[in-house]
Amino acid sequence: MSLYMLVSTFAVAFIITVIGVPLFIPFLVKLKFGQSIRDEGPKMHEKKSGTPTMGAVVFITAMLISFLIFSFIGGEVSAATWLLFIALALFGALGFLDDYIKVVQKRNLGLTSKQKFLGQVAISILFYLVYHFSDFAETLNIPFTNIEVDLGWFFVIFILFWLVGFSNAVNLTDGLDGLVSGLSVIAFSAFGVIAFYQEQMDVAIFCFAIVGGMLGFLLFNKNPAKIFMGDTGSLALGGSIAAVSILVHQEWLLLLIGIIFVIETASVILQVFYFKATKGKRIFRMTPIHHHFELGGWSEWRVVLTFWGIGLVGAVISVCVVIF
């Protein structure tokens, strides 16, 4: 029955997305909700200008429908269900607002950094409050051991850092056709298997709803992309994967399962610090680091496949660490 639920959750999210995206693309084109390409980005990306964005509206809707249906079918809706709903829906709503400002008000950068950060912090605090008053353990698991460290009130700081950090990390990674879609399929599949192994069916259902939605979206988002997810999708996926890692108490494994997100973010931080310290010199040709490889002559598809491969290796190792 449990396996049937997971397959059904995956299938419903996949089917809704596959049907919904082709119907949504003409609607976005009619409204002129097209992607703006930043002037400082790689020149080869200029041809992407005008590609419909905010496609995440479809797959987030599909995921939530599938997730909530099978959560209710499975019995009592748990606190974990609502925590995951908060992460996906509210981070998605923040991203939607950011996208809306970009495409409708023609402000290429969307929300200001301060506005986006305050929104992320507010959502993370709400997540912590629900988590705290639901009597979840406020501990961190030490990798490769059975030791858990009780953080007490410092746990709220960790929640803020983790949710805000990974929502931004996935957002930074979303710069190539299909990159984040494929990495999300890999990462949430890994966490879905871990949650199933731990008998946390609510979390497993959530993960496989996302896998189904993302595989459906990838059909249209792979190179050359017919539609982009926008910040609506990247912020929602980043916040969600951080939330899942907390609920299965495998927070540090996210650094391995989401290794590409970590590398992309680290490349930006290193570039900024080095640029300031050397007054204008750079480590990479351009960051996030996927642009470094593009400017080095790699095709977009080659970069994406390589990064997917690295993400897959990290995910397989992580699942083996937990199960074996």
UniProtKB/Swiss-Prot annotation:
InterPro entries: Glycosyl_transferase_4, PNAcMuramoyl-5peptid_Trfase, PNAcMuramoyl-5peptid_Trfase_CS
Membrane topology of the entry: Multi-pass membrane protein
Gene Ontology cellular component annotations, sorted alphabetically: plasma membrane
Keywords: Cell cycle, Cell division, Cell membrane, Cell shape, Cell wall biogenesis/degradation, Magnesium, Membrane, Metal-binding, Peptidoglycan synthesis, Transferase, Transmembrane, Transmembrane helix
Names of required cofactors: Mg(2+)
Spans traversing the lipid bilayer: 9-29, 54-74, 77-97, 117-137, 147-167, 176-196, 201-221, 227-247, 253-273, 304-324
Pathway: Cell wall biogenesis; peptidoglycan biosynthesis
Catalytic activity: UDP-N-acetyl-alpha-D-muramoyl-L-alanyl-gamma-D-glutamyl-meso-2,6-diaminopimeloyl-D-alanyl-D-alanine + di-trans,octa-cis-undecaprenyl phosphate = di-trans,octa-cis-undecaprenyl diphospho-N-acetyl-alpha-D-muramoyl-L-alanyl-D-glutamyl-meso-2,6-diaminopimeloyl-D-alanyl-D-alanine + UMP
Pfam (any one): Glycos_transf_4
CDD domains registered for this protein in UniProt: GT_MraY
E.C. designation(s): 2.7.8.13
Compartments where found: Cell membrane
Coiled coil residues, start to end: none
GO function term, MF aspect, one: phospho-N-acetylmuramoyl-pentapeptide-transferase activity
Xref: PROSITE patterns: MRAY_2
Example GO BP: regulation of cell shape
Protein function: Catalyzes the initial step of the lipid cycle reactions in the biosynthesis of the cell wall peptidoglycan: transfers peptidoglycan precursor phospho-MurNAc-pentapeptide from UDP-MurNAc-pentapeptide onto the lipid carrier undecaprenyl phosphate, yielding undecaprenyl-pyrophosphoryl-MurNAc-pentapeptide, known as lipid I.
Classification via HAMAP family: MraY
Family: Belongs to the glycosyltransferase 4 family. MraY subfamily.
Protein's recorded name: Phospho-N-acetylmuramoyl-pentapeptide-transferase
